[in-house]
């Protein structure tokens, strides 16, 4: 895994697991709102009334509706940041 994912993946996973409403701003200025349903290396699935697949290269900013706490490295050792532990 590249260094670019060391912050991105835990952040998106926390937003997904805690079902935090997010606003996603695209590079063209469009604002999308919903909850992160899933994500991979290239896309984010955003669920609102419908699911939208948004390519990460089109995303400028992800703004959560409330503050989120990222898991610390010690949490990861205990498996708290694994996707299956929701």
From Swiss-Prot:
Region of interest (Disordered), ranges: 66-86
Family matches, as CDD domains: Hfq
A Pfam family the protein falls into: Hfq
Sm domain ranges (all copies): 9-68
GO molecular function, one term: RNA binding
PROSITE patterns with a match to the protein in the record: SM
Bias-annotated ranges (Basic and acidic residues): 75-86
InterPro entries found in the cross-reference section: Hfq, LSM_dom_sf, Sm
GO CC terms, sorted: cytosol
GO BP of this protein: regulation of DNA-templated transcription; regulation of RNA stability; regulation of translation, ncRNA-mediated
Keywords associated with the record: RNA-binding, Stress response
Record's function text: RNA chaperone that binds small regulatory RNA (sRNAs) and mRNAs to facilitate mRNA translational regulation in response to envelope stress, environmental stress and changes in metabolite concentrations. Also binds with high specificity to tRNAs.
UniProt family annotation: Belongs to the Hfq family.
Quaternary organization: Homohexamer.
NCBIfam families linked to this entry: Hfq, PRK00395.1
The protein's name: RNA-binding protein Hfq
Natural source organism: Pseudomonas entomophila (strain L48)
Source organism phylogeny: Bacteria, Pseudomonadati, Pseudomonadota, Gammaproteobacteria, Pseudomonadales
Gene this chain is encoded by: hfq
């Amino acid at each position: 895994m590249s260094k670019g994912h060391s912050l991105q993946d835990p952040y998106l996973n926390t937003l997904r697991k805690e079902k935090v409403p997010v606003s996603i701003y695209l590079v063209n200025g469009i604002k999308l709102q919903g909850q992160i349903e899933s994500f991979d290396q290239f896309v984010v699935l955003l669920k609102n009334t419908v699911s939208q697949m948004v390519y990460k290269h089109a995303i400028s900013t992800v703004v959560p509706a409330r503050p989120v706490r990222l898991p610390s490295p010690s949490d990861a050792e205990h498996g708290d940041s694994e996707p299956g532990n929701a």
